[in-house]
Design a protein with these regions (language model features):
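Hydrophobic/small residue at the entry helix of a nucleotide-binding pocket
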Residues: 173
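Glycine/serine-rich phosphate-binding loop and adjoining beta1-alpha1 elements at the start
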Residues: 2, 8, 79-164
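Residue-level recognition of conserved structural "scaffold" positions that shape functional pockets
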Residues: 11, 176-178
């Protein structure tokens, strides 16, 4: 099977859905892995890291879609990708189908096999833990006086009291926030 990793093009998206270690694992299982140039840069992975893992670097998304049986990335498809889909191709990404009727219509019309990555985590969602920790950090950022906050630190300092925080929920996100807070 030919597996393709796309570079996410959505503004503000820096994650990658496949690390070089995961690419190496797929290669060891007999897959040919293609990585769009720059696909891992936002997550601090260079093209050379993927090449070292046994992947081939593709020049653009068109090459990935034309070459690969299985195509993956983090965020939902962009309109510029719709015409690149091929019948029978497997798409694995965070589709959020309830949010985009147009995207669902394109997926159905193109006859791809689409999986929503947001619903298929093996051990719950590691992204939820990350979201909880980042949420706490964002809250701490808003406490800074330069950002209009009270100037308190979550942990307190120099005899000043710590800020009071409220974490709603005790799932993976809430637990992640709690781990960072204490």
């Amino acid at each position: 099977m030919k597996v393709g990793l796309l570079k996410d093009i959505k503004d503000g998206e820096f994650r990658t859905i496949m690390t070089p270690n995961e690419a190496a694992e797929l290669v060891s299982l007999g897959a040919e892995v293609y990585v769009e140039t720059g696909a891992g840069e936002g997550a601090s992975f260079e093209d050379a890291d993927y090449v070292k893992a046994g992947a081939k670097i593709a020049k653009d998304m068109k090459e990935i879609y034309a070459t690969c049986d299985f195509v993956t990335k983090v965020k939902e498809l962009e309109e510029c990708e719709f015409d690149l889909l091929r019948e029978g191709q497997i798409i694995f990404t965070c589709l959020h189908p309830a949010a985009s009727k147009d995207e669902v219509d394109v997926l159905l019309k193109s006859k791809v096999i689409a999986f929503t990555a947001e619903d298929t985590h093996r051990y719950g969602s590691p992204n939820c833990e990350i979201a909880g920790k980042l949420g706490l950090l964002k809250g701490a950022e808003h406490l800074l006086r330069t950002n209009g906050g009270s100037g308190q630190l979550i942990c307190g300092a120099g005899g000043a009291p710590a800020a009071n925080i409220l974490i709603i929920g005790a799932g993976l996100a809430g637990t992640g926030a709690l781990q960072l807070a204490y």
